[in-house]
Amino acid sequence: MSLSNAPLGQHVAYPSQYDPGLLFPIPRATNRASLQLGATLPFTGVDLWNAYELSWLDARGKPRVAMATFSFPADSPNIVESKSFKLYLNSFNQTRLPNAQALRDRLERDLAAAAGAPVGLEFISPQRFGELNMAELDGIYIDKLDIEIDTYEPAPQLLQCAPGDEVEETLATRLLKSNCPVTGQPDWASLQVRYRGRPIDRAALLKYVVSFRQHAEFHEHCVERIFGDIMRACQPRQLTVYARYTRRGGLDINPWRSNFESAPPADVRTARQ
């Protein structure tokens, strides 16, 4: 499907009844071709989506609410366009269902069909809301480094290694900003880079992250671009790139890519989420 047909950036009426046809898949392969990624990916990964505005009607018409975390595997053929996902979830608002399991079943079925692969789902009932925590990404934050930069489109040539023996460390920043490729709206994120290899020059990494500031690309694609650029520039033996983007339309998106870890860390939202 062409992005010109996506609901993002268009005036779309909110649905009054359940409609799985609202989901708009976007092939991952299109963007990956521009990153020189083929069928064999250099990473494993997952896109964690947190839904904060999930509601439906029970069999007697009483509203119910919940939260949910969806896990889209990075090797699924498609991502789901975010506004279409929001509209789809809102289509349950006036839909009567016999129980929460009926909602789960529809969500799992519809999202798997859109993504082209099974999608993990954790359902969070109101009884568990008090258990949810906030935390910042682990790592050494590089935001206070004194840098000067006037480049605001991705500039992988800024990346460089520092002298020294191989290290194993985790670096983090809250200064990642990219933009929606359809609407131009800003997308804000915290970024974590965990690696083992030659030391990455921290000031160079911060400049590189800041260079995304006027770049227009979906969250998932930005993280894969960052992963590839770091691999080419510094060739770490192990690398994980993880971004937690701020919420929009009741959804936040948190792409995670790694060539050595089997699963992302606990899905704990940051203060800005």
Curated annotation (Swiss-Prot):
CC terms in the record's Gene Ontology section: cytoplasm
Biological or metabolic pathway of the protein: tRNA modification; tRNA-queuosine biosynthesis
Catalytic activity: 7-aminomethyl-7-carbaguanine + 2 NADP(+) = 7-cyano-7-deazaguanine + 2 NADPH + 3 H(+)
Active-site residue numbers: C180, D187
GO biological process terms, semicolon-separated: queuosine biosynthetic process; tRNA modification
Keyword tRNA processing annotated: no
Any matching Pfam family: QueF_N
Lineage: superkingdom: Bacteria
InterPro entries for the chain: GTP-CH-I_C/QueF, NADPH_dep_7-cyano-7-deazaG_red, QueF, QueF_N, QueF_type2
Presence of the UniProt keyword Cytoplasm in the record: yes
Compartments where found: Cytoplasm
Assigned EC number: 1.7.1.13
Family to which this protein belongs: Belongs to the GTP cyclohydrolase I family. QueF type 2 subfamily.
PANTHER family in alphabetical order: NADPH-DEPENDENT 7-CYANO-7-DEAZAGUANINE REDUCTASE (PTHR34354:SF1)
Subunit-level organization: Homodimer.
Name assigned to this protein: NADPH-dependent 7-cyano-7-deazaguanine reductase
Upper lineage: Bacteria, Pseudomonadati, Pseudomonadota, Betaproteobacteria, Burkholderiales
Gene for this chain: queF
